[in-house]
Amino acid sequence: MKVKVGVNGYGTIGKRVAYAITKQDDMELVGVVKTKPDFEAYRAKELGIPVYAANEEFLSRFESVGFEVEGTLNDLLEKVDVIVDATPGGVGAKNKPLYEKAGVKAVFQGGEKANVAEVSFVAQANYEKALGKSYVRVVSCNTTGLVRTLNAIREYADYVYAVMIRRAADPNDIKRGPINAIKPSVEVPSHHGPDVQTVIPINIETMAFVVPTTIMHVHSVMVELKKPLTREDVIDIFENTTRVLLFEKEKGFESTAQIIEFARDLHREWNNLYEIAVWKESINVKGNRLYYIQAVHQESDVVPENVDAIRAMFELADKEESIKKTNKSLGILK
């Protein structure tokens, strides 16, 4: 059985998820939805992907430039089993009634509130909770990054404190900033901690800053331990955790710039780094406190989660099998 998949929103996340779907042997990409005939819409068409307008209102935008679409979102919903909603934050919740009316399952993204779905999802942490569900929310890039590493050491963690150093905008985004400032999130603790708790039960508080960079987020994590753990133990745990990679400053990984260059050297599409990058030298244990620093490629770390979410919703595979299939199809290193 191949699950028929549509992607609503063909931007930063949507186009990466659409690409990932085409790499799965148990899924079929039926079409993608756009609001306007921009370069991404033209590229989708060049790739042979059917393009649909978001609704009747937006059809004129395509017609005015002679861009032939296959119909509207409603037409696409008649042809799919599940829709991946990769629209801007808050839009997914507005779209949900359309999916319910069409009887189509939906995967939402982290820009939506948790109550949009039956479960918030990170594959290696709570895959089983999404089995057979109709509405699943893949959590944000930051939350996914935190959950990947914290879940691996969860049995040792008593309380987590994390500082999120967030990129200001994606590389193609000219509307956001700042470009010459550091912007604190003055709502303390920040929303990231409660979002982690929608996936795993863990005590966590976070703070966040936005800085003038586009390529990655960085997390500075401190964990109060309830059970003894050595630096070597943590290194061993992370080395054996899927979708987490250790990078060494000694080998030239001094910043996020070198980590992204590593992703480029892998010749991956859009220099995706699906894995969470942890600086090996930053891992340290002092008394009952564990410290480490990690980087998150905000454009791609959630992509494999979307694929695994679909498998769980349709019960196509168990957790280990799905993660293994997704990793292999996308060239994820471990």
Curated annotation (Swiss-Prot):
One of its GO terms (molecular function) is glyceraldehyde-3-phosphate dehydrogenase (NAD+) (phosphorylating) activity. D-glyceraldehyde 3-phosphate binds at S140, C141, N142, H192, G193. It comes from the Archaea. The active site is at C141. Transmembrane segments: none annotated. One of its GO terms (biological process) is glycolytic process. Homotetramer. It catalyses: D-glyceraldehyde 3-phosphate + phosphate + NADP(+) = (2R)-3-phospho-glyceroyl phosphate + NADPH + H(+); D-glyceraldehyde 3-phosphate + phosphate + NAD(+) = (2R)-3-phospho-glyceroyl phosphate + NADH + H(+). Its EC number is 1.2.1.59. Belongs to the glyceraldehyde-3-phosphate dehydrogenase family. InterPro entries: DapB_N, GlycerAld/Erythrose_P_DH, GlycerAld_3-P_DH_AS, GlycerAld_3-P_DH_cat, GlycerAld_3-P_DH_NAD(P)-bd, Glyceraldehyde-3-P_DH_2_arc, NAD(P)-bd_dom_sf. Keywords: Cytoplasm, Glycolysis, NAD, NADP, Oxidoreductase. This is Glyceraldehyde-3-phosphate dehydrogenase. Pathway: Carbohydrate degradation; glycolysis; pyruvate from D-glyceraldehyde 3-phosphate: step 1/5. It comes from Pyrococcus abyssi (strain GE5 / Orsay). The keyword Cell division does not apply. It is found in: Cytoplasm. GO terms for cellular component: cytoplasm. NAD(+) binds at T12, I13, G111, R167, Q298.
